[in-house]
Amino acid sequence: MEAEETMECLQEFPEHHKMILDRLNEQREQDRFTDITLIVDGHHFKAHKAVLAACSKFFYKFFQEFTQEPLVEIEGVSKMAFRHLIEFTYTAKLMIQGEEEANDVWKAAEFLQMLEAIKALEVRNKENSAPLEENTTGKNEAKKRKIAETSNVITESLPSAESEPVEIEVEIAEGTIEVEDEGIETLEEVASAKQSVKYIQSTGSSDDSALALLADITSKYRQGDRKGQIKEDGCPSDPTSKQVEGIEIVELQLSHVKDLFHCEKCNRSFKLFYHFKEHMKSHSTESFKCEICNKRYLRESAWKQHLNCYHLEEGGVSKKQRTGKKIHVCQYCEKQFDHFGHFKEHLRKHTGEKPFECPNCHERFARNSTLKCHLTACQTGVGAKKGRKKLYECQVCNSVFNSWDQFKDHLVIHTGDKPNHCTLCDLWFMQGNELRRHLSDAHNISERLVTEEVLSVETRVQTEPVTSMTIIEQVGKVHVLPLLQVQVDSAQVTVEQVHPDLLQDSQVHDSHMSELPEQVQVSYLEVGRIQTEEGTEVHVEELHVERVNQMPVEVQTELLEADLDHVTPEIMNQEERESSQADAAEAAREDHEDAEDLETKPTVDSEAEKAENEDRTALPVLE
């Protein structure tokens, strides 16, 4: 039973592989789940990284180093060849027409290290070349050629990181080369009588590319399947012997990687021709001299760096750098700029200027490029990018807001709700600004804090300075806040007598108080009415000043902090206010009557005294 179960588990289903490939190909064509875009000759190919890494060693190594690259541009491969390789990767089919097309696909497959594609091309070449070999075998064995070489040069162009051409010269010594017709095909491509042929291949820019290209040169002469092996000619009369000394030179360079470019003056070696060329400048007699301090430098880059670091303010800049360029120096951090636009953008970091404004949400930016990025998010309403404010879009009218409060107030228009409530008159409002306007107009309540200073009046009497106070009632509690003293217009008052309370509380201190005339006496200030409604400020509405004898005297009255402890606000209703006003009117009427009695009393007394004197004179004198 166990053996049968094992056999059942080992069953294979070849159709499953085909089904998986078909599904992956459909996803690629419909651009679903693709995670890489390959750009070849300006054409975009969508694919899956896992599939490419499974079929190509090149992509396997590349995706290990660069895991987050969404776009990859491939150079050195034609668009047609890459399309065939992509189709082969997802369908296992090759649809190639013509030998030229097959050669392009072969080169691309070798570059991308797609071994399965190379095997498929080898099978195709064998099938196409089999009938031709049967017909031409006899002729090829009889034909031989002789090629006379006179110092021909095979040059290989190597692309480097600095994008400068590097040439490797291989000298082929004079001699006679005898090669069979099968092996001469490759040699004819790279050598001809009294000419130098360049074989250019730009497949990469790394150090290993030099070895790969050199190996590609020699591989054309050492392929075993072509049977065109080249050997040194030990006997000149042997027709089957060959003599190519140049190939030995190439093999010698391949065995010494570090000796590709050798300096004969100091015995140093370099892998890249650019480094070798820069090194050779150190042996040259040319030098760059600083005209200010007479220092000499072998390299131009070192000379320019010296001028910029030490002699920039003294004008030590080369003529090439001085033509039409101005140096702009930041006055805040002393940073220097060649372009005025960069200098102006840098200044905005210090000044905080933001001249570019969004027409939709009125947000301002220091750079125009930042505004353009913001407009993309602001116009579409999909939300701003990293570092920018979040946007809120109304699903009803598509309006966009950059703050939650604005968005919430806008939604009320569509819902019809009135969440803003006035607790004084029980009215409801849709917008918050409508409620604030109602409180200001109907109830005389403003949102801002209105400070009321105790009015101060100047006097000739020396008094102690006191800070003005504002009393604010909030939630049934009274808070006294100190404020700066504010001088107001002086009041014209007459002073009748010095109030005794002021003297007792030490509010008035003057050594010359006794010198004041008796007619000049200090009056008092009377506060008319104080509003103490809950939730509002307490402020002075009226100021009454008594006038006696119409004598203009500047009086300054002050409240001391010690007296504020005795101030206790009383909440009065409307009836208490009316009764207090009636009592005040009654007291004023009684005072007026007393004043009239005082005026009439001296007249009555004088008449009674006169009558008494007359009576005394009328009486006879008794002896």
Curated annotation (Swiss-Prot):
<keyword id="KW-0863">Zinc-finger</keyword>
<keyword id="KW-0539">Nucleus</keyword>
<dbReference type="GO" id="GO:0000978">
    <property type="term" value="F:RNA polymerase II cis-regulatory region sequence-specific DNA binding"/>
</dbReference>
<keyword id="KW-0479">Metal-binding</keyword>
<feature type="short sequence motif" description="Nuclear localization signal 1">
    <location>
        <begin position="137"/>
        <end position="148"/>
    </location>
</feature>
<feature type="zinc finger region" description="C2H2-type 3">
    <location>
        <begin position="328"/>
        <end position="350"/>
    </location>
</feature>
<dbReference type="GO" id="GO:0001817">
    <property type="term" value="P:regulation of cytokine production"/>
</dbReference>
<keyword id="KW-0678">Repressor</keyword>
<dbReference type="InterPro" id="IPR011333">
    <property type="entry name" value="SKP1/BTB/POZ_sf"/>
</dbReference>
<dbReference type="GO" id="GO:0001227">
    <property type="term" value="F:DNA-binding transcription repressor activity, RNA polymerase II-specific"/>
</dbReference>
<protein>
    <recommendedName>
        <fullName>Zinc finger protein 131</fullName>
    </recommendedName>
</protein>
<dbReference type="InterPro" id="IPR036236">
    <property type="entry name" value="Znf_C2H2_sf"/>
</dbReference>
<dbReference type="InterPro" id="IPR013087">
    <property type="entry name" value="Znf_C2H2_type"/>
</dbReference>
<dbReference type="Pfam" id="PF00651">
    <property type="entry name" value="BTB"/>
</dbReference>
<keyword id="KW-1017">Isopeptide bond</keyword>
<keyword id="KW-0238">DNA-binding</keyword>
<dbReference type="GO" id="GO:0000122">
    <property type="term" value="P:negative regulation of transcription by RNA polymerase II"/>
</dbReference>
<feature type="zinc finger region" description="C2H2-type 4; degenerate">
    <location>
        <begin position="356"/>
        <end position="381"/>
    </location>
</feature>
<feature type="compositionally biased region" description="Basic and acidic residues">
    <location>
        <begin position="573"/>
        <end position="617"/>
    </location>
</feature>
<keyword id="KW-0832">Ubl conjugation</keyword>
<feature type="domain" description="BTB">
    <location>
        <begin position="34"/>
        <end position="98"/>
    </location>
</feature>
<keyword id="KW-0677">Repeat</keyword>
<comment type="function">
    <text>Plays a role during development and organogenesis as well as in the function of the adult central nervous system. May be involved in transcriptional regulation as a repressor of ESR1/ER-alpha signaling.</text>
</comment>
<keyword id="KW-0804">Transcription</keyword>
<feature type="cross-link" description="Glycyl lysine isopeptide (Lys-Gly) (interchain with G-Cter in SUMO2)">
    <location>
        <position position="289"/>
    </location>
</feature>
<feature type="zinc finger region" description="C2H2-type 5">
    <location>
        <begin position="392"/>
        <end position="414"/>
    </location>
</feature>
<dbReference type="GO" id="GO:0002682">
    <property type="term" value="P:regulation of immune system process"/>
</dbReference>
<keyword id="KW-0805">Transcription regulation</keyword>
<feature type="zinc finger region" description="C2H2-type 1">
    <location>
        <begin position="261"/>
        <end position="283"/>
    </location>
</feature>
<dbReference type="GO" id="GO:0005654">
    <property type="term" value="C:nucleoplasm"/>
</dbReference>
<comment type="similarity">
    <text>Belongs to the krueppel C2H2-type zinc-finger protein family.</text>
</comment>
<feature type="short sequence motif" description="Nuclear localization signal 2">
    <location>
        <begin position="317"/>
        <end position="328"/>
    </location>
</feature>
<dbReference type="Pfam" id="PF12874">
    <property type="entry name" value="zf-met"/>
</dbReference>
<dbReference type="GO" id="GO:0045111">
    <property type="term" value="C:intermediate filament cytoskeleton"/>
</dbReference>
<feature type="region of interest" description="Disordered">
    <location>
        <begin position="573"/>
        <end position="623"/>
    </location>
</feature>
<feature type="zinc finger region" description="C2H2-type 6">
    <location>
        <begin position="420"/>
        <end position="443"/>
    </location>
</feature>
<keyword id="KW-0862">Zinc</keyword>
<feature type="cross-link" description="Glycyl lysine isopeptide (Lys-Gly) (interchain with G-Cter in SUMO)">
    <location>
        <position position="601"/>
    </location>
</feature>
<dbReference type="InterPro" id="IPR000210">
    <property type="entry name" value="BTB/POZ_dom"/>
</dbReference>
<feature type="zinc finger region" description="C2H2-type 2">
    <location>
        <begin position="288"/>
        <end position="311"/>
    </location>
</feature>
<dbReference type="GO" id="GO:0001228">
    <property type="term" value="F:DNA-binding transcription activator activity, RNA polymerase II-specific"/>
</dbReference>
<dbReference type="GO" id="GO:0008270">
    <property type="term" value="F:zinc ion binding"/>
</dbReference>
